Design a protein with these regions (language model features):
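Glycine-rich beta-alpha loop elements in corrinoid/cobalamin-binding modules
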Residues: 1
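Radical SAM [4Fe-4S] cluster-binding motif and immediate context
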Residues: 5-157, 169
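C-terminal EAL-domain catalytic cores of bacterial cyclic di-GMP phosphodiesterases
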Residues: 161-165
Length: 172
């Protein structure tokens, strides 16, 4: 279980100018041909109580940035919402949280929550990989470009979240 993996940051004391990498899940429900994460066929989650406890440690230490390295952070909506709510409710006005997401999976409830956060609290790295429908099909990527565009525009409309979109050069 992911909860058995020890929290390695508790022995550190100096977090100034550090970026912390953190994982609340492993695996990915998708089967994209280019990605090693598709080998791990199931999405496994660290318990929310443990995640909140560990996030509070980062917040208390005023870590400048916590970068979630979950492959698709918002693949499990309840998990993502609970973490985003916790971050908003416990904002220390210093720490920034970075998430790798699939924008076409964002729900209206998630967009409303994200748009209500303080400017700079969250940044989103959005996996697009390609906008060519033939390429998307060839790489076995599950994505709705219209939903993605709409979600990116809705998040962008609040002006509080930095977003960047990932594209992979050299795909078929």
């Amino acid at each position: 279980a992911l909860d058995d993996i020890p929290f390695l940051y508790s022995d550190l004391s100096d977090f100034e100018n550090r970026i912390i990498y953190y994982e609340s899940s492993r695996g990915c429900p998708f089967r994209c041909k280019y990605c090693l994460s598709s080998i791990d066929k199931q999405l496994r989650l660290r318990s929310l109580d443990l995640v909140k406890k560990e996030l509070q440690f980062f917040l208390d230490k005023k870590v400048p940035q916590v970068k979630f390295i979950d492959r698709t952070f918002n693949a499990k909506h309840e998990h993502a919402l609970a973490i985003w709510r916790y971050i908003k409710e416990n904002d220390n006005e210093v720490t920034n949280f970075h998430f790798e997401i699939s924008a076409d999976l964002l729900t209206e409830k998630e967009i409303i929550l994200l748009n209500s956060m303080r400017k700079g609290l969250v940044q989103l790295e959005i996996g697009v990989q390609s906008t060519n429908p033939d390429t998307i099909r060839e790489i076995n990527r599950s994505m709705d470009l219209c939903k993605l565009k709409c979600a990116v525009e809705k998040v962008n409309s609040a002006g509080n979240i930095h977003q960047h979109l990932d594209l992979i050069a050299g795909l078929p």
